[in-house]
Amino acid sequence: MKGILLLFLKLVVLFVYLCSSVLSECPALYRRYSKEHTFCKTKNQKCNIKRWGVSQDDRNTIINLHNKVRNNIALGQDQSGRLPAAGDMLEMEWDDELAQIAQKLADQCVFKHDCDDCRKVENFDVGQNIFTTTITAVEIPDPFWVDAIRSWYNEIYRFTRDFIKPFTSDHATGHFTQMVWSKTWRVGCGYVLYEKRKDSWTQLYVCNYGPAGNLDDSELYKVDKPCEKCPSNTCCGSHCKKKKSTSYLGLCDVLNGSGPDFDETDFSNYIFNCDFKPESSSDCNNKVEGSNKWQTRQIISDVYKTVVLNGGENTVLKFTSNIQSKDGFCLTVSFRKGPNIAGTNNVGEFDVQLERKGAKPLNFRLDSDGNQFLPYSMGIPMNHPMQINIKFSVPKGAPAQYLDISYIRARPGLCN
């Protein structure tokens, strides 16, 4: 009996060690996004993997083939001859983080997409293409990325220009449309080759893309002359030559790590605009009451404010600028909130409070569930000067909760 008890204790210790080891290798943000995040998975030990990973030569092949396809689309020279030119097609770059997660999926030896949240990263949502083939040969075959990318591209012959805008997703063309989604500009890929039986080799190719494409009711690209609709912080064509940047003639080349600026909104008539960027206005000036754990996170193409609270903690972010309009105003807060570890309860209490002298504050309790920023608009039919408070609290004994704020904006007049 004593021997059985000792064996049981050893197994418990081993289990705890393995769990703690996995957690230590799984970044906190990935554990927030999904309890099944692909990066946090280990290799499939039942799979007889013989080769894995993507060489530098294969990286170059992947990037070059994607950009050739995108450039042909942008110039109106695609092989199908049916698609119009694109004015905002970005040039693709390699992304190591996307590649690491793609490799982890390939290591599972299963020809199946992972879930959207399972591959999410902080910078953006992530799209995905996969391809597999089985080869009979005595010698271990080399990876041949040309076949995978050609297979995805050939879906163009089932795609028509009617679906460019508004875009409608279709499983028959989803690989192609992700390849040429104009706002996607980062790609990272993974590869494995494993032996199913003697002299039978299965190759699995995975590419992850960011920002993700295939968004229904959006647009595949802006139909226009090449380079005409490039976002800020990019160059294209002859403009790239002036910047001494090599680029494809029809592709918008991102100039630096800040990424392209997709926001085309004119904020000149707004009475309050805080997006937490370094060049943002004085509207972002604030002070903190309660737990001062707020951080400003710089990511590609964006910035956001974030806080993580434990059970029993609370915080108030008080903005010092007044909002006032004789016609009232429409206040929009873009946020996301939830448990800091996926799968635990979403119990954080988030309030947007508007204060004015001599009156009871207006209070709006907001909630969300998911990893996407949610813009929430509130019509305020008052012409008094008002101050914004962002209040967040977590009940005692509850698991840690997070709140992210992307922007806070107000324009004159009530919301549409």
UniProtKB/Swiss-Prot annotation:
Post-translational changes noted in the entry: Contains 9 disulfide bonds.
Known Pfam families for this protein?
A: CAP
Q: So which residues are the signal peptide here? A: 1-24
Q: Quote the InterPro entries the UniProt record gives.
A: Allrgn_V5/Tpx1_CS, CAP_dom, CAP_sf, CRISP-related, V5_allergen-like
Query: TM segments?
Result: none
Q: Where in the cell is it found?
A: Secreted
**Keyword field:** Allergen, Amidation, Disulfide bond, Secreted, Signal
Expression by tissue, per the entry, reads: Expressed by the venom gland.
Q: Which sequence positions carry the modification called Arginine amide?
A: 82
Keyword Metal-binding among record annotations = no
User: The SCP domain covers which part of the protein?
Assistant: 57-217
Disulphide bond pairs: none
Keyword Membrane listed: no
What is a single cellular component term in the Gene Ontology annotation? extracellular region
The record's Gene3D superfamilies line, in alphabetical order, gives: CAP (3.40.33.10)
Family assignment from sequence similarity? Belongs to the CRISP family. Venom allergen 5-like subfamily.
| Other noteworthy facts | The primary structure of this cryptide Pep-4 is identical to that of cryptide Pep-4 from Tityus obscursus (AC P0DRE9).
Protein name in UniProt = Venom allergen 5
Q: Which organism is it from?
A: Tityus serrulatus (Brazilian scorpion)
